[in-house]
Structure formats: structure tokens, C-alpha cells
Amino acid sequence: MTAAPDARTTAVMSAPLAEVDPDIAELLAKELGRQRDTLEMIASENFVPRAVLQAQGSVLTNKYAEGLPGRRYYGGCEHVDVVENLARDRAKALFGAEFANVQPHSGAQANAAVLHALMSPGERLLGLDLANGGHLTHGMRLNFSGKLYENGFYGVDPATHLIDMDAVRATALEFRPKVIIAGWSAYPRVLDFAAFRSIADEVGAKLLVDMAHFAGLVAAGLHPSPVPHADVVSTTVHKTLGGGRSGLIVGKQQYAKAINSAVFPGQQGGPLMHVIAGKAVALKIAATPEFADRQRRTLSGARIIADRLMAPDVAKAGVSVVSGGTDVHLVLVDLRDSPLDGQAAEDLLHEVGITVNRNAVPNDPRPPMVTSGLRIGTPALATRGFGDTEFTEVADIIATALATGSSVDVSALKDRATRLARAFPLYDGLEEWSLVGR
């Protein structure tokens, strides 16, 4: 005779979040409201489709699966093996790569694994200087990459704010790195991957391209692909790619064994199978015409914002655009000649309903918690459905705020921003779906 279910266990397992933990439920509801009613313009953020939320909130969160499909250290992996293979196959197809590892928990973990596979502690790593737009994992002294490896850096031209490939070559010839990283966190232009490949070959280095920010543009065919040129390519799955917060690695088959081993057991234990399911969904979406259209609107929106912020009324207030424009999804704003610093400008835009992040400009004189710049991104608004008309309005709100400064009519600008946000509903009906149990 089968025993009756324990009533206490049944209650906990079936009760909605709002009943089990009303504090967290209330905070989720507030955050949903914030995302709905503000204009999200942090370049590294995006909105995932409901299908990705469902995959990441699925029963796969229960499953441990150390190892690779067909070679697990746990039983019961017959279904998650198929999930991971789908994600790997979709990543390879989307980027035209020979192999893919979809297990990294983040872009930083992906970079850690690649460097683990390609070099040994104490060997030389050459990357873009953090002060010129590089990422923490490209050699910053407090990061693992700065502690494990001997680091050299290339930068941007002080006048044009562009990467000078002749200068990169000269630095590489002198420094003789084991690995060169081409990639960025705050650089608004397309990189010359062929030139980086040539330099790497000349000095006997491996080339890692970190395409975390522009992977979605590459997937849509709107940005040159680094895959034919690089030995290995790392990326996040959020940002322009529009999936959940996580990472992946693609590249040449000859590095697959070393990288797989560097991910597990080198850097991580068990993969997050619910997150990998979300990656698989995001990668499927990224192969669609609708996704390509979203990326076109992302690029167009960034150019509209850059153009508006270079207009005479804004320039007169001491605001400029780093490198004189953008080729990608973000605009880097220079406030060194403005009464506003980066923190003050971020706070001001937050008041009017636009979320951005303060960001250092090349060779910024201010400390990193203050900065002299802003990084403004368009992916999240393009995901909501914004086109040129809406981005023109957003650009004018930002321009008015930055040009006018602390005396701006915050209420009037916030009304404009809120109207725009509410014209493009986000996650309509999500409360009833499950998150807050209403």
C-alpha cells in the first residue's frame, strides 16, 4: 500500500512564492515594475524572452550533471544530455564554429577557462587596458587574470580614441605574449580581427576574441565575425545575444579537449542545466529573422543617440561622444568638459527614468566610482520594440538632461520617458504566470 504524501512536504512544494516568501515576492514585483516603467539603457543588460525565463525556472534546476553529454559522473542525465547537445549544436551553427562549450556560468568564467587552457601561470597576456575600455578579465591587476599572468596592455590613440593596430603590433613585438585578447567592455568601434590574427601569428601567440558585447550583432550578420580569425572566442549570452546571464566558448576543434577540461574540472564543478536550457532557447531565437531585425534596430538606435549627443546644443554644454560615434550597440559619452561627472549624470538620468551606467572614458582623471563618462546601450529598448522614432525621442530626453544639467525639468522628462516605456509593455501578464503568485 502506498503511503499518503506528507502534508507538510506537499504544501511547501506546491505553494506559490508569494505565500512561501512574501518578502522576496514583493521585491520581485517591485523590480518587475521598475523594468516595465523605466528605459533600460545599460549596455550589458537586456530582456530575455518569456521562453528563456521558463527554461531557467524549470525542473532542470534540480539536476546535477558533471561532465559532458555521454560522459557524465551522475546517472539520470539522458534528457539533460540532449539539452546540452542542442545548445552546443546551435552555438556552432549560429557562429560557424567547429566546437562549442556551453557550460561556463558567466563570461568571466569563460575567459578564465580559455586562459587556463591556452597558457600557464606566469606566462604573458596582452589585452586592452581597462582604462581604455578593456575588461577586468583581460589583465586587470586585482582580477585573476592580473594575478596569475604577466600582463601587458595596448590602448587607444589619445586623439582619436581608436585602437591603433600599428601600436598594438609594436607592443606585441616587444612584449611577446603567449595570448592576445581582442575584445572590450567599453569601446564603440569594430575591431580589426584580421590584423589581430596577423600580429598573433607574427609573435607566436594564440588569439582569444572576447565578443561578449557584440555577439548578437555577429549572429545577425551585422558585425564582422571573429570566429574565422581567432583560435578561441568567448562570449556572454546576455547583452546583445539576449539570453540569460551566462557564458559560452566557441572556436577551433584543436582546442576543444583542453578547453572542455579547463571548464570542468579546471574552473567549475557541475554545469547549471536550467541555465544551459535557457541558452539553447536563446540561441534558437538568435537564428531567426526577427532577431536580426532587432539587432538592426539596436545599431540604428545607438547611432541616433550618438548623433543627437554630438549636436551643437549638447556640445556647448561640454558633452562629447568618444571616437565621434559608434559602430555597435553602445555610445560612450565624455563629460570631462561638462559640469556633470559620470556619477552625477547617471543619477540625473535615473531621476528622469533612464537607467545607464557611469563609465570611465579613455585615461579618465576621476576615480572609478565617479568617472567622467557614461555608457549608454540600446539592446534592451530594441528588444521591447523600439525603432527609429522612439530612439529619436529617447535621444532627445538624454540630450536635454545632459545639456541642461541639474536645472532640468525632471518631471517633464520623466513623463516623456514613462510614456515611451508604457507604450511597449514588458512581460504582460507575468504576475499571473508565476513569479509573484498573484
Curated annotation (Swiss-Prot):
Its cofactor is pyridoxal 5'-phosphate. PROSITE patterns: SHMT. Pathway: One-carbon metabolism; tetrahydrofolate interconversion; Amino-acid biosynthesis; glycine biosynthesis; glycine from L-serine: step 1/1. It catalyses: (6R)-5,10-methylene-5,6,7,8-tetrahydrofolate + glycine + H2O = (6S)-5,6,7,8-tetrahydrofolate + L-serine. HAMAP family: SHMT. Optimum pH is about 7.8. Is completely inactive at pH below 4.0 and above 10.0. GO terms for molecular function: glycine hydroxymethyltransferase activity; protein homodimerization activity; pyridoxal phosphate binding. It comes from Mycobacterium tuberculosis (strain ATCC 25618 / H37Rv). Catalyzes the reversible interconversion of serine and glycine with tetrahydrofolate (THF) serving as the one-carbon carrier. This reaction serves as the major source of one-carbon groups required for the biosynthesis of purines, thymidylate, methionine, and other important biomolecules. Also exhibits THF-independent aldolase activity toward beta-hydroxyamino acids, producing glycine and aldehydes, via a retro-aldol mechanism. Thus, is able to catalyze the cleavage of L-allo-threonine. The modification N6-(pyridoxal phosphate)lysine is found at K239. This is Serine hydroxymethyltransferase 1. Homodimer. Its EC number is 2.1.2.1. The record marks H238 as: Plays an important role in substrate specificity. GO terms for biological process: glycine biosynthetic process from serine; glycine metabolic process; L-serine metabolic process; symbiont-mediated evasion of host immune response; tetrahydrofolate interconversion; tetrahydrofolate metabolic process. (6S)-5,6,7,8-tetrahydrofolate binds at L130, G134, H135, L136. GO terms for cellular component: cytoplasm; cytosol; peptidoglycan-based cell wall; plasma membrane. It is found in: Cytoplasm. It comes from the Bacteria. Binds 1 pyridoxal phosphate per homodimer. This is unusual in the SHMT family, that normally contains 1 pyridoxal phosphate per subunit. Belongs to the SHMT family. Keywords: Amino-acid biosynthesis, Cytoplasm, One-carbon metabolism, Pyridoxal phosphate, Transferase.
